Design a protein with these regions (language model features):
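Surface-exposed intrinsically disordered loops and tails
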Residues: 193-201, 271-276
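C-terminal beta-sandwich/jelly-roll accessory domains of carbohydrate-active enzymes
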Residues: 242-277
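Conserved alpha/beta catalytic core and glycan-binding cleft of carbohydrate-active enzymes
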Residues: 1-124, 128, 137-141, 174-177, ...
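Active-site rim elements
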Residues: 92-103, 149-157, 275-277
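Hydrophobic alpha-helix feature that most strongly marks membrane-spanning transmembrane helices
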Residues: 53, 114, 133, 167, ...
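Extended hydrophobic/aromatic segments used for targeting, binding, or gating
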Residues: 132-164, 257-270
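Aromatic- and carboxylate-lined catalytic core of secreted/periplasmic carbohydrate-active enzymes
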Residues: 152-183, 198-201
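Carbohydrate-binding surface patches
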Residues: 198-250
Length: 277
C-alpha cells in the first residue's frame, strides 16, 4: 500500500450511493453518511454524481432507462444500472411540476458533491443541464448527442448560478474540505465534535432503513488555521423523503445564531443574509 495524497481513488461508490439516496431508496443513510465524510489518509477520494460511463446528471433525473440505439449496437452497450429516476415522465417534458422536481433533484445532487469531504468533481455540462438524450455511452458519436450543449434555458441558467454559489460557499468554509477525515468526536475540547449527525431530534440520528433524512453539523473551530479566527459552524439538513420533515437543530455555539444560507428548493439567500459567513 502506498500513501500519497497526490493519488486519488476515482470510483463509482459515491455516485451510486448518492443517486440511490437522492431518489429516495430505502436503507441508504448508513452508507451516504459515511460517504460524505470519507477522506482516507492513504489516497484522496473523488466524489461525483455523473461521469463518462453513465447518464449525465440531467439525464439521471429524466430517464429510467438508456437509449443507446444511435450507437449501432441494438442498445446492448452502456451501463444497464444507472440508478436514475425520471421524476414522472420519460425524457423531456413541458410539465412544470416535473421540471421543478428535476431542478430540485439536480441541486440536491450538486449539494451532496460539494458539501462532502474529499475532492469534488462535476462532469462537464452538468452545471448547465447538459443532456445526451438518455444515451449513456456516446463515445462513438460526433453529433448533438455527444456534444456538450451549453444551454441558455431558464433552468440551465438557474443551475449554473446555483453551482457557482455552491462552489463559492465550499471555498469559504475550510471545514468542508479538511486535510483529514472527521473523527466524529471533540478531540480538541472545543465543546462540539468536529462533525456530528442529527435527525428529527438534535444529537440523535435515526438511520433506520425506512428513514430518508438526516443532518450534519460541522464545528468550524476545527478548521482554524495558524491561529486565524475560527469559521462558522455549519448545519446541513438532507431530506430525500417526499414530504416535509422537521429537524432538531443543536443550540448554536458561543451565543451565536443560526442563519439560513440556502435551500435546494429555493436557492441561495442574498450575500448580506449570510453566504459570506
Amino acid at each position: 500500500n502506498v500513501e500519497n495524497k497526490n493519488l486519488a481513488n476515482f470510483n463509482d461508490d459515491f455516485m451510486v450511493s448518492a443517486r440511490k439516496f437522492i431518489k429516495g431508496d430505502e436503507d441508504m443513510l448508513n452508507t451516504i453518511s459515511y460517504k460524505i465524510k470519507a477522506n482516507p489518509p492513504a489516497v484522496a477520494v473523488v466524489n461525483y454524481v455523473a461521469n463518462h460511463n453513465t447518464f449525465t446528471l440531467y439525464d439521471a433525473v429524466s430517464y429510467d432507462k438508456k437509449y443507446n440505439q444511435a450507437n449501432g449496437e441494438n442498445n446492448r452497450d452502456g451501463a444497464v444500472y444507472n440508478y436514475s429516476w425520471n421524476c414522472g415522465a420519460e425524457g423531456d417534458t413541458r410539465k412544470r411540476k416535473i421540471n421543478e422536481l428535476r431542478k430540485h433533484q439536480i441541486k440536491n445532487a450538486l449539494s451532496l458533491v460539494l458539501l462532502s469531504q474529499g475532492v469534488p468533481m462535476i462532469y462537464a455540462g452538468d452545471e448547465m443541464c447538459n443532456s445526451q438524450k438518455g444515451n449513456n455511452n456516446p463515445y462513438c458519436l460526433d453529433n448533438e448527442i455527444s456534444w456538450t450543449n451549453w444551454n441558455t434555458t431558464a433552468m440551465a441558467k438557474e443551475i449554473l448560478d446555483f453551482t457557482k454559489k455552491l462552489i463559492q460557499f465550499r471555498k469559504q468554509h475550510k471545514i468542508l474540505h479538511l486535510s483529514s477525515e472527521p473523527r466524529l468526536m471533540d478531540y480538541k475540547s472545543y465543546g462540539l465534535p468536529d462533525m456530528s449527525y442529527h435527525g428529527s431530534k438534535a444529537w440523535y440520528a435515526d438511520f433506520s432503513h425506512f428513514n430518508r433524512h438526516f443532518s450534519v453539523m460541522y464545528c468550524g473551530k476545527y478548521a482554524t488555521v495558524d491561529g486565524k479566527e475560527d469559521e462558522a459552524d455549519l448545519f446541513i439538513a438532507y431530506n430525500m423523503f417526499w414530504e416535509m420533515i422537521k429537524f432538531g437543530i443543536p443550540s448554536a455555539r458561543n451565543k451565536r445564531q443560526w442563519k439560513v444560507v440556502f435551500a435546494t428548493d429555493s436557492g441561495f439567500k442574498e450575500p448580506s443574509d449570510g453566504i459570506e459567513r
